[in-house]
Amino acid sequence: MILVIDVGNTNIVLGMYDGDNLVHHWRISTDRTKTTDEYGMLVKSLFDHSNVSFEQVEGVILSSVVPPVIFPLEQMSQRYFNVRPIVVGPGVKTGLDIHVENPREVGADRIVNAVAGIAKYDGPLIIVDFGTATTYCYIDEKRRYHGGIISPGIMISVEALYQRAAKLPRIELATPPTVIGKNTIQAMQSGTYYGYVAQVDGIVNRMKREVGEATVIATGGLARLISEHAETIDHVDSFLTLEGLRLIYERNQK
């Protein structure tokens, strides 16, 4: 089986593939201070809970937007699985034609999402990834990646409101019962949630005015919540990044 690892700023998502089937997946917090052995023991506990053994891991691929976490995960793969991992970056075959000023600046997560998006949905595509930052990427019908948009994630907005406004409480992100809030918490929830929904629809519509019609895919931890009221999202694919990692792994075995 193949272990795929997606390292984000807030969470690390791991998936285990048997062929092209995702048979297990886990989410843990990203911790820049963890050592190789600490990550190894954490992964072992996840494996034990799912009745998976280290010996079943035949290959590992990882993408990361947090450089300090790459080394301990590489070492973990070699020490505990006896496998040298593929790290998504320059020199790794993706099959994607990148049309931006500096291709090396494009985040590994955005490349991985684009690979999976084209394989599953064909182009043209707009992929919206709701993470610590929210990213919007455009890929045309010829598999050319043209760049996109990076904006602060919704949870950054929630936290900033609490930290910078003295009388406002920290809130849980939730869909309020009405747009017009009847109390402070509802008003804050409405502002963050519906404000973000409006941002998504506004940005996607502006992108479409520039490039024409495109299928819009949402992924990331908050994709389902936002898509409940976002009018421009066509599909929610929670495991798009994991699928992209699997595809890139396979392309680099040939």
Curated annotation (Swiss-Prot):
The active site is at 109 (proton acceptor). ATP binds at residues 6-13, 132. K(+) binds at residue 129. A monovalent cation. Ammonium or potassium. It catalyses: (R)-pantothenate + ATP = (R)-4'-phosphopantothenate + ADP + H(+). Its main location: cytoplasm. CDD domains: ASKHA_NBD_PanK-III (cd24015). It is found in: Cytoplasm. Its EC number is 2.7.1.33. Belongs to the type III pantothenate kinase family. This is Type III pantothenate kinase.
